């Protein structure tokens, strides 16, 4: 069904450019650039990675007057076909979301040398690919410091989608930040795993309760759509708090999500789309950290009073030290 939706969407765009394109060109004097995005599994509504990516291109569509379409694959096996579909349909930029896109994009990109591609959280060394990476350790260090200051048990938790080096960078930064402010801290880590690690809220809720039963009172979830299970767990347990990831999840359970480590996929995609429109988009690796506007904490909208001005000032000071280089998150 999703392939049919994509096909119909592409067909409508081709019909538009074939039939109504002359009128558009007469009105604006220029052709709209087309951007297609293949989301990661879990799709929209994850309040995390995919939602952030979508928000960035929606903003780019409004500000740069581009055509924008997206597709939500049901499984990893569909990634390559959807990337190929967009490129074959003549899209100017095809965006691949997530590290699992690396292998499919390596196969597709060389077949379309005149099409520009961008991939988030992976490196594809092709002359027509922009690889977008984030210094997630910096943001995880920040939220780890929040957890280290706020825990009442000196025990905090981490839930990852799978146990792999890329995701463990989040865990490592989180541990380092917690230890930076609280030398007595213990961090317990569990992983969702299974056949759909980034879209299994039931398993993430089970792991959240297991961590709670082992004294963890704050849990950082880095598991895409599975993280909804963590949010459900904190909503049902008065003495359990969450830290969100990728998008601002603070409002999902007001007052129970201390902060969110915002990996600003939205800002990165907005930036490279602007470069595309200006004819300045180049291939290669782009790294977005706190200093580059690619990483931040959320605004503590619902937890300012709970955390308190003194701790918030310490968190701000840590951020400034990271930007200046005084604190280096290795």
Give the role of each language-model region.
Residues 1-5:
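Positively charged n-region of N-terminal signal peptides that target proteins for export
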Residues 22-330:
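A residue-level marker of the well-folded mature domains of exported/periplasmic proteins
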Residues 15-18:
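C-terminal motif of bacterial Sec signal peptides marking the signal peptidase cleavage site
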Residues 7-13:
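Core hydrophobic alpha-helical membrane-spanning segments
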